[in-house]
């Protein structure tokens, strides 16, 4: 998903009723990316009705166009559809990723959230209703090796696994809430290839379609030995371009589940590149990329 930054502001006057206080609310946002249909973003407000039942009420579905403008699903500039029948009781807001245009409750894929109060109410990925973390403490390494080759480590610079020299898990990542998965990727030449989706760093990932005949380790990773996608030849050897994973970016993203795209999201958490001179068994330190990767959204009530 291509990262597109945008800004907008909407001013809406809400008429007070049933003892509610009249007021104006402005909405501002930036850093969202377009989602492939039928996926879209949706805003929600947590409200309590006259029967003291608390529920999430939608304030509109939206997406982002190629120019970075916030748009309604049917086209045209996004406008708040409704603040719900009990807007005066609103205490919380969140933005989710949805894959159905007919839904009465939010999906598990909450991207941003935060309490709503008088004044500015920013929604954040760090809120407990969203991820509960900014991911900037995440760390990791990967090891160049091909444990599924026969013999082991044949074409050993054609594989990358998230384990250390003691063969233990080498990623330190926050636990994700329901509705999200990590996914590892390798950009080999000009082609970005999935290395699998996972939630636990001490378990196998979602699959290893490019591995050799051997058994894969119980950690995320991939051997690029077989079933190469178009534009590549596996294994990566001295006669292929590129010749190995040296110089090829390996990175980890956060992806919605289900996923709006087969390409990496903008939410890149870790990235590493094996330097020239790396050998089979070398561990490569990954740098944290999380800062600024998540969008912002805020409500201002005054």
How should each PLM-predicted stretch be described?
Residues 1-5:
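Positively charged n-region of N-terminal signal peptides that target proteins for export
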Residues 17-302:
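N-terminal targeting/export leaders
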Residues 6-10:
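Hydrophobic helical h-region of N-terminal Sec-dependent signal peptides
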């Amino acid at each position: 998903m291509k990262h597109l930054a945008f800004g907008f502001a909407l001013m809406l006057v809400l008429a007070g009723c049933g003892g509610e206080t009249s007021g104006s609310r402005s909405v501002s946002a930036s850093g969202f990316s377009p989602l492939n249909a039928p996926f879209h973003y949706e805003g929600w407000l947590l409200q309590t009705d006259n029967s003291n039942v608390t529920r999430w009420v939608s304030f509109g579905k939206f997406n982002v166009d190629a120019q970075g403008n916030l748009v309604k699903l049917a086209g045209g500039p996004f406008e708040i559809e409704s603040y719900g029948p009990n807007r005066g009781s609103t205490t919380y807001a969140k933005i989710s990723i949805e894959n159905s245009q007919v839904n009465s409750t939010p999906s598990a894929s909450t991207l941003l959230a935060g309490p709503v109060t008088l004044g500015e109410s920013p929604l954040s990925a760090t809120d407990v209703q969203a991820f509960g973390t900014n991911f900037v403490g995440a760390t990791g390494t990967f090891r160049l090796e091909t444990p599924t080759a026969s013999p082991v480590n044949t074409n050993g610079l054609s594989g990358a696994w998230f384990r250390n020299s003691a063969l233990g898990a080498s990623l330190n990542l926050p636990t994700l809430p329901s509705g999200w998965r990590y996914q590892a990727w390798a950009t080999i030449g000009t082609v970005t290839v999935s290395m699998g989706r996972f939630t636990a760093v001490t378990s196998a990932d979602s699959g290893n379609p490019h591995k050799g005949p051997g058994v894969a380790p119980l950690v995320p990773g991939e051997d690029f030995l077989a079933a190469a996608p178009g534009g590549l030849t596996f294994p990566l050897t001295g006669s292929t371009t590129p010749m190995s994973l040296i110089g090829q970016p390996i990175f980890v993203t956060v992806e919605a589940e289900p996923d709006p795209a087969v390409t990496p999201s903008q939410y890149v958490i870790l990235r590493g590149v094996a330097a020239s001179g790396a050998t089979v068994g070398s561990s490569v330190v990954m740098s944290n990329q999380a800062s600024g990767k998540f969008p912002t959204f805020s409500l201002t009530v005054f």
